[in-house]
């Protein structure tokens, strides 16, 4: 029954309507029994006593005619004389349920309050009980002796047209309410169904179809955020495909080269050529090894929840150690290194920060022209550490836009795999810092870390 949200909401709403109607009836019934019943009894008793007083003072002849007249005025009347003979006036009672003891008490002059004392029942409204015990009774004195007179208003006659009106009203109320519930439920479910279908398309890899925002409530917000999510997932999927293609290319190229070298090694008889092949093979395996390490590091950075950033890193020492370790690169190109480093500490992940600064320094060494200078400064301002590395040579504007993209290379001849600066940017962002590039006559990377 509840396999769809549509049926669930519709049935819930209809159940609420019916339950509300039932509870309203029960509470109305309780209100009648505990509040209105005594008042109704007293009002009818007063009317009956006024009728008795009128009969006693005015002496309408005969009494039977007078009672018939009362019956025609929408009252139901039953009389019982001392011999137990009963007469009925007005609309006939549905049941004759009054007890003999009640009749005797009235004949003896005691008032009868059957309406007031009607037993309470949950699903029976005493006001409409057309029974002789649901009356008030008093004694009339006649020439033939005492006469017990029991009376109640003829509810059926009084409210016959109203009951038809009420029945039509309730029927129409239920029909219209249920119809509107079904229609409104459909209006709620329709965009949800559209979301479900769109989700199915996304599961199949289709990120191109947006859903129209048709509302301005919570569902409208959900539609808007779904479209945003769809776009983001599409971008992630494109990045994933691009990443797989790049990795495949970066791995396939050295493997193809390695296969060619193995074939050449197998065929050549020249020892010098064999050694050159072996040396080149070692270089290729080192490149693949570096690529693997950087891919693993990227994966670690993309899932950084396990990383800690509690090391007290001495940046001055860290940068000097990198420069000292890479001294051979400066010697190969006759580079001059100028450093101006403040004695600064920063709380973060020392291993990752070492990798980030190492990438920037090696990148400057690799792309600086022969016999040029590299300037490195480390300064601080209020709550900010600024690392600046500058080398001669510029980067084209189009290249600068993609310099931090994964696998982006400035030149196809470059031995780099294009991951170093992407890794550096990820590390700096994980430390809540920023990295920017400016390139005119010189190329300058600026890293800002908040203390």
From Swiss-Prot:
Membrane association type: Multi-pass membrane protein
PROSITE patterns linked: HAMP, HIS_KIN
Main location class: membrane
Pfam short name (any one): HisKA
Protein's UniProt keywords contain Kinase: yes
GO terms, molecular function: ATP binding; phosphorelay sensor kinase activity
Subcellular location: Cell membrane
SUPFAM superfamilies tied to this protein: ATPase domain of HSP90 chaperone/DNA topoisomerase II/histidine kinase, HAMP domain-like, Homodimeric domain of signal transducing histidine kinase
Record PTM text: Autophosphorylated.
Keywords: ATP-binding, Cell membrane, Kinase, Membrane, Nucleotide-binding, Phosphoprotein, Transferase, Transmembrane, Transmembrane helix, Two-component regulatory system, Virulence
Reactions performed catalytically: ATP + protein L-histidine = ADP + protein N-phospho-L-histidine
TM ranges: 9-29, 164-184
Residues covered by the Histidine kinase domain: 246-451
Protein task: Member of the two-component regulatory system HssS/HssR involved in intracellular heme homeostasis and tempering of staphylococcal virulence. HssS functions as a heme sensor histidine kinase which is autophosphorylated at a histidine residue and transfers its phosphate group to an aspartate residue of HssR. HssR/HssS activates the expression of HrtAB, an efflux pump, in response to extracellular heme, hemin, hemoglobin or blood.
Name of the molecule in the record: Heme sensor protein HssS
Gene source species: Staphylococcus epidermidis (strain ATCC 35984 / DSM 28319 / BCRC 17069 / CCUG 31568 / BM 3577 / RP62A)
Gene for this chain: hssS
């Amino acid at each position: 029954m509840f396999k769809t949200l549509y049926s669930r909401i519709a049935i819930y709403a209809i159940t609420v309507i019916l339950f509300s109607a039932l509870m309203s009836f029960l509470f109305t019934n309780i209100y009648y029994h505990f509040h209105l019943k005594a008042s109704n009894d007293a009002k009818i008793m007063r009317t009956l006593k006024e009728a008795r007083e009128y009969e006693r003072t005015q002496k309408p002849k005969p009494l039977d005619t007078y009672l018939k007249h009362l019956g025609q005025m929408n009252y139901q009347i039953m009389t019982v004389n001392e011999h137990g003979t009963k007469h009925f006036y007005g609309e006939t009672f549905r049941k004759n349920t009054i007890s003999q003891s009640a009749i005797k008490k009235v004949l003896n002059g005691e008032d009868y309050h059957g309406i007031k004392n009607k037993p309470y029942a949950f699903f029976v409204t005493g006001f409409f009980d057309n029974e002789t015990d649901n009356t008030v009774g008093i004694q009339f004195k006649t020439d033939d002796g005492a006469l017990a007179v029991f009376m109640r208003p003829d509810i059926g006659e009084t409210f016959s047209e109203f009951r038809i009106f009420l029945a039509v009203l309730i029927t129409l109320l239920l029909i219209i309410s249920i119809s509107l519930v079904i229609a409104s439920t459909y209006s709620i479910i329709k965009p949800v169904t559209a979301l479900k279908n769109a989700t199915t398309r996304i599961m199949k890899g289709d990120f191109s179809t947006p859903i129209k925002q048709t509302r301005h409530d919570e569902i409208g917000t959900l539609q808007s955020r779904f479209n945003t999510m769809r776009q983001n997932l599409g971008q992630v999927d494109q990045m994933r495909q691009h990443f797989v293609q790049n990795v495949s290319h970066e791995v396939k190229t050295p493997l193809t080269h390695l296969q060619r070298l193995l074939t050449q090694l197998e065929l050549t008889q020249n020892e010098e050529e064999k050694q050159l092949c072996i040396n080149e093979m070692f270089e290729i395996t080192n490149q693949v090894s570096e690529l693997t390490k950087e891919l693993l590091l990227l994966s670690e950075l993309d899932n950084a929840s396990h990383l800690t950033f509690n090391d007290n890193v001495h940046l001055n020492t860290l940068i000097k150690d990198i420069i000292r370790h890479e001294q051979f690169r400066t010697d190969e190109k006759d580079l001059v290194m100028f450093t101006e480093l403040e004695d600064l500490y920063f709380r973060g992940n020392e291993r990752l920060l070492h990798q980030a600064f190492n990438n920037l320094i090696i990148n400057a060494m690799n792309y600086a022209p022969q016999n040029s200078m590299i300037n490195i400064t480390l300064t601080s301002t209020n709550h900010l550490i600024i690392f600046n590395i500058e080398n001669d040579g510029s980067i084209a504007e189009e290249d600068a836009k993609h310099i931090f993209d994964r696998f982006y290379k400035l030149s196809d001849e470059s031995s780099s795999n294009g991951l170093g600066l992407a890794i550096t940017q990820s590390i700096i962002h994980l430390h809540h810092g920023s990295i920017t590039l400016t390139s005119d006559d010189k190329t300058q990377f600026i890293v800002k870390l908040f203390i």
